[in-house]
Design a protein with these regions (language model features):
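Active-site rim segments in enzyme catalytic domains, especially the processed small/beta chain
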Residues: 76-82, 88-102, 107, 116, ...
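Internal maturation/activation junctions in enzymes
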Residues: 209, 241, 262, 274, ...
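Short loop/turn motifs at secondary-structure junctions and domain boundaries
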Residues: 284-285, 416-421, 479-480
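Extended C-terminal subregions enriched in glycine
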Residues: 432, 478, 511-512, 520-581
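Bacterial N-terminal signal peptides
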Residues: 7-19
Length: 613
């Protein structure tokens, strides 16, 4: 009876955590810390995290639950992420090393730099036609190979215990119909002028030609059928006396990437002005790679590699280790200034050096070294904000690259409804202290729906550039450098924390602040995500028309007027964002190996969710 009651209470917590902050449930937070001993799931929507909790209750581990949460989110969080997108994943199983699932699809083989530079008008509709060599922000030309399914299958096969059918069951049920919420209705309404140009997208998201009403049962029948076909392929291959789980998973993968689904998507995209073909699907495989690592004051902070922006957090932590941040005081003018200036330096290196390591040579060891950080640290002027973009010269171990060309500041000219729509997050800790952190993204509204497959196609190719001197220049079969950046932390080699967030280029800025809130200032996970934040846009944007806003600093008003005034006096171009105005919205789970209790925080800025068992 006790266990049944506890489960019910935890499920109720999903919905309690769902609303905007209206009352104080802790001395310093709007929401309570969510704690459990058998497992915790945190993510972006209550039905998504319930899917993961369901798998934990059925004996699955953190990987099984994380994959179930991702797949459920790919159905119901389509405003920010869906099945045709991408998802980098960090995993730490008991007794094993930290690994990263490189869940980022490649550019189509027809996606050459010359194609985008030379075309006057692309095959996309007029609203998404980009001139001047820019890659469209949405439409058929912006898609890379969908990576979600292969990343999930790879994680299950090598680190999970469940079948795809088991972890995909909640997603299929949700595709059959779920009560649509306010956020999804808003995105359908505001993005309909773009996606209505693609008949299948209009058919799916405007049933009967109308925007759904909040609470309507929203059905994705084509997607449900596709998911069932994939599961059927798994079941047929795994039948027999040995009940071969691996064979079933590989059959499911092949059905999507080498079988009828790939052919149908490829045919549709080719017929509608896109570049992706069935052969691009067949060439893709999500690799299991090694993460990069920062050692910061006894904590080991793991990030995905240089095909993401994750190493920028490592660079930033290496620089900040030379400062007494506690003495500065949390969110004091000197604290915010120091973090912002360190981030500017790290992001300048990102823009200058990061890209797909399969295609470009990157001075990885030097960029991540403490010696390089020591060279860069003195560039942080404690009294003045930098307005210059200053990449370093790690190959020659010099603080500044002498030949660096300054990027001209420019604001985005794209209409709001055409801009990138962001991301979600998934974090899981199970009863054994296994850790799972993922940042699912892509294939958000407005998106092309690939015919009768029901699969929304991604827009990540826009993160590639056409500058031939950039390590992130577009090329056939090359991955765009992405902003998606899950985080996994050990303390003295023991499991300690997982955290991830939406927020585009600002993801690592938010995660840095949450991480330091815990490590430097001893905050609990809910305090850490609710504390006032800031971000700078002093970088070349990874999206849209790649704006650059030198010296910009967005600050939530809760830091206080005096702090805002002092930051302005230092030369920051401060924009006050309101009390809860920054773009990011992390979830974080902290694990205590001494008693097996996991504690979660979920950001109220975008109604993140956490549940415990």
């Amino acid at each position: 009876m006790y266990i049944r009651t506890l489960i019910v209470l935890c499920l109720v917590t999903v919905f309690v955590l769902g609303g905007l902050p209206v009352s104080t449930t802790h001395a310093d937070t709007f929401r309570p810390v969510v704690r459990g001993k058998r497992g915790v799931v945190a993510g972006g929507q209550p039905l998504s995290v319930e899917a993961g909790l369901r798998i934990l209750q059925r004996g699955g581990n953190a990987v099984d639950a994380g994959v179930a949460t991702i797949l459920a989110a790919s159905v119901i969080e389509f405003s920010h992420f869906s099945f045709g997108g991408e998802v980098p994943i960090l995993i730490k199983l008991k007794g094993q090393k930290v690994v990263v699932i490189e869940g980022m699809g490649q550019a189509p083989m027809k996606a050459t730099r010359e194609f985008f530079v030379n075309r006057a008008h692309g095959g996309a509709p007029s609203l998404t036609t980009r001139k001047g060599g820019l890659i469209p922000s949405t439409g058929p030309l912006s898609a890379t190979v969908p990576a979600v399914l292969d990343a999930c299958i790879t994680a299950l096969d090598q680190f999970g215990t469940k079948t795809l059918a088991e972890v995909m069951e909640p997603a299929i049920q949700l595709a059959d119909g779920f009560p649509i919420d306010e956020l999804r209705v808003q995105y359908i309404r505001t993005r309909s002028p773009i996606f209505s140009q693609w008949p299948d997208a209009k058919r799916v998201f405007l049933p009967g030609g109308e925007v759904p009403k909040v609470g309507d049962i929203f059905v994705q029948a084509d997607l449900a059928r596709t998911l069932r076909e994939i599961v059927r392929a798994e079941r047929l291959a795994s039948k027999g006396p040995r009940n071969n789980r691996h064979a079933g998973l590989m059959a499911a993968r092949d059905y999507f990437y080498r079988g009828p689904i790939a052919r149908r998507i490829g045919d549709y995209m080719q017929a509608n002005g896109g570049l992706i073909a069935a052969g691009d699907f067949a060439r893709f495989a999500a690799k299991v790679g090694q993460p990069v690592q920062a050692d910061y004051r006894g904590y080991q902070v793991y990030k995905a590699g240089f095909w993401t922006q994750g190493p920028a957090l490592v660079e930033t932590l290496n620089m900040l280790e030379g400062f007494d941040l506690k003495k500065m005081g949390h969110n004091s003018p000197s604290y915010i200034h120091t973090l912002a200036e360190a981030l500017k330096l790290a992001l300048a290196d990102r823009d200058r050096y990061y890209g797909d390591p399969d295609f470009v040579k990157i001075p990885m060891t030097e960029l991540l070294s403490k010696n390089y950080a020591a060279l860069r640290r003195p560039l942080i002027d404690e009294s003045r904000a930098s307005l210059a973009q200053q990449p370093g010269d790690p190959s020659n171990m010099k603080a500044v690259l002498a030949s660096a060309v300054q990027t001209i500041g420019r604001a985005s000219a794209l209409p709001e409804i055409e801009r990138a729509n962001d991301t979600t997050c998934v974090n899981v800790v199970d009863k054994d202290g296994n850790l799972f952190s993922a940042t699912p993204s892509g294939a958000w509204l407005p998106a092309v729906v690939a015919g009768d497959t029901g699969v929304l196609m991604g827009q990540r190719l826009q993160s590639s550039l056409t500058d031939p001197n950039s390590p992130n220049v577009v090329a056939p079969g090359k991955r765009p450098r992405i902003t998606l950046t899950p985080t996994l932390v050990l303390k003295g080699g023991e499991p300690f924390m997982v955290l991830s967030t939406p927020g585009g280029d600002n993801q690592d800025q938010a995660l840095l602040q949450v991480l330091l809130n815990v490590i430097e200032f001893g905050m609990n996970p809910q305090e850490a995500v609710e504390a006032p934040r800031f971000d700078t846009q002093h970088y070349v944007s990874s999206f849209d028309d790649h704006e650059f806003l030198p010296g910009s600093l967005n600050v939530e008003s809760r830091v206080g007027l005096k702090t805002i005034e002092e930051l302005s006096l230092k030369g920051h171009k401060v924009k006050v964002q309101g009390e809860w105005g920054t773009l990011s919205a992390p979830t974080v789970i902290i694990y205590d190996p001494s008693n097996g209790v996991a504690s979660a925080g979920a950001d109220p800025r975008r109604s993140r969710y956490a549940v415990a068992w």
